[in-house]
Amino acid sequence: MAGTAAHPEGITNPPIDELLEATDSKYSLVIYAAKRARQINAYYSQLGEGLLEYVGPLVETTNAQEKPLSIALREINAGLLTHETVADSLPPVS
């Protein structure tokens, strides 16, 4: 079968192993990326209203259809974001 090879994007680019180096665990990576993706989504939603409360993508978007999560993962991989681990504020369960 002739044709061009697919160039997958999203969770396969950047590789998950590189993304895990930026966080303590895969769970914190999920939270980290999801929060940033929500900020990017809110930014795009606000553009039509003239409000600029959120910061837009920090990496160049190559495709107008690129999902906010893919953008967030590329930002994390590029080292453009920082995050802090906050101690639980809930008292221990007895």
Curated annotation (Swiss-Prot):
InterPro entries: DNA-dir_RNA_pol_omega, Pol_omega/Rpo6/RPB6, RPB6/omega-like_sf. Its EC number is 2.7.7.6. GO terms for cellular component: DNA-directed RNA polymerase complex. One of its GO terms (molecular function) is DNA-directed RNA polymerase activity. It catalyses: RNA(n) + a ribonucleoside 5'-triphosphate = RNA(n+1) + diphosphate. GO terms for biological process: DNA-templated transcription. Keywords: DNA-directed RNA polymerase, Nucleotidyltransferase, Transcription, Transferase. It comes from the Bacteria. NCBIfam families: rpoZ. PANTHER family: DNA-DIRECTED RNA POLYMERASE SUBUNIT OMEGA (PTHR34476:SF1). Belongs to the RNA polymerase subunit omega family. Promotes RNA polymerase assembly. Latches the N- and C-terminal regions of the beta' subunit thereby facilitating its interaction with the beta and alpha subunits. The RNAP catalytic core consists of 2 alpha, 1 beta, 1 beta' and 1 omega subunit. When a sigma factor is associated with the core the holoenzyme is formed, which can initiate transcription. HAMAP family: RNApol_bact_RpoZ. This is DNA-directed RNA polymerase subunit omega.
